[in-house]
């Protein structure tokens, strides 16, 4: 099915999608601040421009939207229109994520992905549960991991 917008309108709409200071980033920043952690945001000098960098623990945190980064949860749904386009676009995002995570690990950084579904929606984690998972991972100095509605898991 053809796009209902012309190229210029579609481009304008896509540019309007926030890439920083999103609601999920603000929630996570509040929780990190509440834990007394010092962090930097959107560090362009690191691969993938991590949303949060906690130098003290040599770790970076990404907040990933479930749609844009193809998380297998209830928030991800393949669009009914232009399916091939979207699957290709999202597939490129996933491949870039893998490449960025690998490069960060090679540089000695631990990586945490906090999925959108853990931060918002009907199955989101409570602030208490999310804070516990964050503290457990950041202070525990374990391997790279991800947090979703089911809790914390090692990155595959």
Swiss-Prot record:
InterPro entries: DNA_mismatch_endonuc_vsr, Restrct_endonuc-II-like. Keywords: DNA damage, DNA repair, Endonuclease, Hydrolase, Magnesium, Metal-binding, Nuclease, Zinc. Binds 2 magnesium ions per subunit. Binds 1 zinc ion per subunit. Its EC number is 3.1.-.-. The gene is vsr. Its cofactor is Mg(2+); Zn(2+). GO terms for molecular function: DNA binding; metal ion binding; T/G mismatch-specific endonuclease activity. Mg(2+) 1 binds at residues 51, 63. The keyword Nuclease applies. Belongs to the Vsr family. Mg(2+) 2 binds at residue 51. It comes from the Bacteria. Coiled coil: none annotated. This is DNA mismatch endonuclease Vsr. One of its GO terms (biological process) is mismatch repair. Deamination of 5-methylcytosine in DNA results in T/G mismatches. If unrepaired, these mismatches can lead to C-to-T transition mutations. The very short patch (VSP) repair process in E.coli counteracts the mutagenic process by repairing the mismatches in favor of the G-containing strand. This enzyme is an endonuclease that nicks double-stranded DNA within the sequence CT(AT)GN or NT(AT)GG next to the thymidine residue that is mismatched to 2'-deoxyguanosine. The incision is mismatch-dependent and strand-specific. It is an enzyme of class 3 (hydrolase).
């Amino acid at each position: 099915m053809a796009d209902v917008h012309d190229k210029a309108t579609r481009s304008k709409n896509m540019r309007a999608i926030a890439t920083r200071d999103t609601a999920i980033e603000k929630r996570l920043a509040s929780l990190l601040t509440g834990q007394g952690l010092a962090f930097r945001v959107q560090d362009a000098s690191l691969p993938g421009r991590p949303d949060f960098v906690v130098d003290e623990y040599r770790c970076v945190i990404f907040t990933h939207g479930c749609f844009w980064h193809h998380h297998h949860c209830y928030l991800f749904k393949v669009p009914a229109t232009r399916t091939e386009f979207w699957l290709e676009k999202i597939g490129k995002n996933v491949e870039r994520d893998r490449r960025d995570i690998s490069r960060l690990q090679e540089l000695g950084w631990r990586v945490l992905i906090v999925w959108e579904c853990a931060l918002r929606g009907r199955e989101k984690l409570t602030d208490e549960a999310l804070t516990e998972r964050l503290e457990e991972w950041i202070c525990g100095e374990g391997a790279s991991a991800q947090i979703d509605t089911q809790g914390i898991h090692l990155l595959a």
